[in-house]
Amino acid sequence: MPLNTIPNKGLTSRGYPSDRLVTPIIINGDMSVAQRGTSFSSMSNGQFITDRFFYDRAGLGITAAFTGSQSTDVPTGTSFANSIKMDVTTAQTLGSSGGTYLGVTTKVEGYNYKLISNQKGTISFWVKSNLTGTYSIVFRNNGNDRVLVEEYTIDSANTW
């Protein structure tokens, strides 16, 4: 399931692919609601950046540090007004212990997930980084006993 090769058949005014067949199941995917604030220094595990999206980490020896904010840097040609911006203030050196992850997490509610249960689906998202490379998106259930990891590639730095 290569996430970076979804054909672009145009975008709706909300920035979603125009050929989608169902309503998006990710709540606040446009990052427009940020009731807890819009800028955070020294992000702690579980801290929300915008509503429904939070900094998530697990593993031994995590020394990474981030600031997080609701940003107005968005892809051109969409009607998105906001995005999430994470700035690394202390980089993480990964050891051999495994099981370490750092990222932004959102949870799909059960009633929304039920709309796509046992069906093929597509996830589309915008990403921008000052570093090129291969990254991962992870899907997991609440019990952490079912996990799907898919890779995506950022080929060009500082572009959406």
Task: Enumerate the predicted regions with their spans.
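Extracellular and organelle-lumenal recognition/adhesion modules and their flexible linkers in secreted
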Residues: 2-160
